[in-house]
C-alpha cells in the first residue's frame, strides 16, 4: 500500500488496518494491545512505542518499517543530492580485499591521524558533501598505509582505517542507505581486528553503531544482542586498554535508550548510572568520535526520558545544559530534536519549533533529513489552528 509523504505513524496504522479489513477492536485483540492505546496512537494523541509497533506489525503481517515513514525503511528520496557521491564510496567499501594500487604513497601516520580526525569532524557536523567527496581518496590512502607500513605505525593505520570506514555508516544511515551503512560497519570491524591494542574498543564501538538501524525499525531484540556482543569484545580489557572505558560507557548509553523504548525505566536508570560512573573516570573525551563523557550522559538522560514518554521530566532535565567547546554538532542537534519531540507531546508547538530551529542552526543537514524531525513536523502540521510561517518553512524543508 502506497501512502503519501507526511502521513504519521498513527495514520499509517489506521490505513493499513482498514486495508486488512480489521476494526480497531479486532486489531487490538489480534495484537494483544490496549484498545484505548490503539485509538489514541491512530489519532496522534499518544506516541507508538517500539513494543507497540512490533505487536501491531505482527498482527498485520508486516515489517515494523512498513508502519514508519521514510527514512526508517530502506531507500532514499529520488531528489537526494548526495546520490552522485555514493558510487565511489561504495567502490571503496567493495574493493577492500584487493592489494593497494601500485602508485600508492601514503602520508606519514601523524598526517593520516589528522586527516581522519578532520573527516570524522565533518561527519559529526553532518557536513556530508565535503566528507563524501574526500572519503574515497582517504580510504584508499589508509588502505595502502595499513598494507605498506610496519610495526606500530601499521597497527595505528589499521585503527585509523576502521575509524574512517565509520564515515560510510554516518552518511548511509542519514540518507536511508542501510545497506551501505552495514557494509561500512562490516569493513570497520575487518580493519579493527588488525588494530593491536585498540581492537577491543573499536570492535565494541562498531557494535554500538550497528544498533542504530535496528533501533529505527523497532527490533529491540537485535539491539540487545548487538550490545551484548559489543560488551563481549571488552572482556579481559582494563582501564588502560585504549578506548575500552569509552566503548563500555557508550554501550550503556545505547542500552539505556533501548530500555526506554521498552518502557523499562528501572533498567534505563541502571544503564545511565553505569554510564555516569564511567564518565566520571574518563571525563570528556573524543575517542572514536563518540564524544563520551558527562555531557553525553546528560544528553542521553533527556533522550531516554523522551523515549519513555516522561516529557515534562525531559524538559526539566535539559534546563541549564551547556555543551563543551567543539562538541559534536549532530549530538547537539539530536538533543534539540528530542526536546522538540517532548514539547510537541506537551502541546507546546512554539517551543517545539524553537528546538527544531536550534537543531537546524547547529546541523542543518541532519535536521532536514532526520526521521524524528519529519515525524514531529508532520504532527505539528496536523495539530489544527493557523499554520505559522515557521511551521510552513519546516514543512517545505522536510518535504512533508
Give names to the regions the model predicted.
Residues 32, 51-66:
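DNA major-groove recognition helix of helix-turn-helix/homeodomain DNA-binding modules
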Residues 26, 37, 47, 52, ...:
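Residues in the helix-turn-helix
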Residues 31-47, 69-72:
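Recognition helix of helix-turn-helix/homeodomain-like DNA-binding domains
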Residues 61-77, 297:
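Short C-terminal boundary/hinge segments that cap the last helix of small helical domains
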Residues 1-8:
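A detector for short, charged/polar N-terminal pre-domain segments
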Residues 5, 104-400:
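Conserved binding/catalytic microenvironments
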Residues 11-30:
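Short basic helix-loop element that most often maps to the first helix and adjoining turn
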